[in-house]
Amino acid sequence: MAEALLHDGTTISILVSGDGRALLIPADLKPRSESEAQTMRDWGADPDLGPTLVSALSQSYRVVAADYEGHRMAHPAPDTLTPENVAADFLAIADAAHADTFGYYGYSWLALCGLQLAIRTNRLWALIMGGFPPLEGPYKSMLAVTRAAHSAAARSSEQSPAVNLPVEPGDWDAATIQTNEAQTRQFVTLYEALQDFGDSTVALARDLPRLAFAGSADQIVYGPRWGNVTVRIGEPLAAHERELIEAGWDVQVLPALDHLSAMHSDVVVPLLKAWLGKVGRDQVGREQ
C-alpha cells in the first residue's frame, strides 16, 4: 500500500487496484465482524460497500481508494478541516498514487469534498457527487446538526448506544453520540467555513463531466437534540435538475430511495459503470 502525507502531518494508507484511468474513491475497505455488519444492515446501510465498489470499478479503472472519513475519525483535525485543506488532502492522495489526472466519486459529505476539490484543481477528468446536491446544498442545516453533535460530545465522553434495542432504518433522530469532542468539532470547522460558500455561483470547467445523484426520499429529519432541522438532499436536486443540466451536470434522482439506500453498492455500481462508460465514449468521440 502507498501512503499520503496529509495537511495535518498524518499519513493515510492508499490502495491502488486495477488499470486504466485513475478514479479516486474515499472508501472504507476494512473487514466487518458479523455483529458490525448486522448493525449496519439494521440501520439500512451496506457493510460491504467499499470492497464491492473497488472490486467492481477496478475491472475498468485504476481505482485509488483511501478511507478519508475513517482516517479523520482516527486522526481528527478539529481546527483545520477546512475546504482548502480537504482539497489539498485529496490532491496529496492522488499524488501518492501517481495520478496526474483522476476522476472522483464521493457520497454525502465526501461528495461536498469533491465539489470543493473541483473548484480548486484542473486535474479532474470526472466528478461524481452522490447524496449531496451541487446546488442549494444543506450547509446551514448541517452546521446546526454538527454543532448539536459537538455540544453533546463535549458534555460527555461516555455516551454510548443502548444495547440490543431495535432500530428503525433511517431513524437519524434516534442516533446516539459515539464520537468525541475533537471528532465532532472538525465537522463544525468544515461547515462553518462553508457558510458563505455560494454554490449557485460555482463555475466548473464546462468540459468537466459531472454527475449528481440522490434518492428522491433523501430527507433527514432531526428533532430537538439535533437542532430541530431537516436536511434536504433529494428535494433540491430534483428542483434544480433543469438548471443543473443547463450548467453541464448530468442528474439522476433515484425514485423512493433515501440517504442510505441510494448509496448501496447494488445501486451505485451499475450507476457509476454506466455513467463513466458514457463519459469515456463521449471523450473518445470528441477526439476522433
Please name every model-derived segment.
Residues 20-35:
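Short beta-strand element of the alpha/beta-hydrolase
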Residues 44-73:
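Conserved alpha/beta-hydrolase
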Residues 84-102:
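Conserved acidic catalytic loop of the alpha/beta-hydrolase fold
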Residues 112-123, 127-155:
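Flexible "cap/lid" loop of the alpha/beta hydrolase fold
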Residues 134, 184-202, 234-238:
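Active-site nucleophile elbow and catalytic-triad environment of alpha/beta-hydrolase enzymes
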Residues 212-214:
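Short beta-strand/loop motif that positions the catalytic acidic residue
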Residues 216-253, 259:
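Conserved loop-alpha-helix segment in the C-terminal half of the alpha/beta-hydrolase fold
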Residues 245-288:
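Catalytic active-site module of serine/aspartate enzymes centered on a nucleophile-bearing elbow/loop
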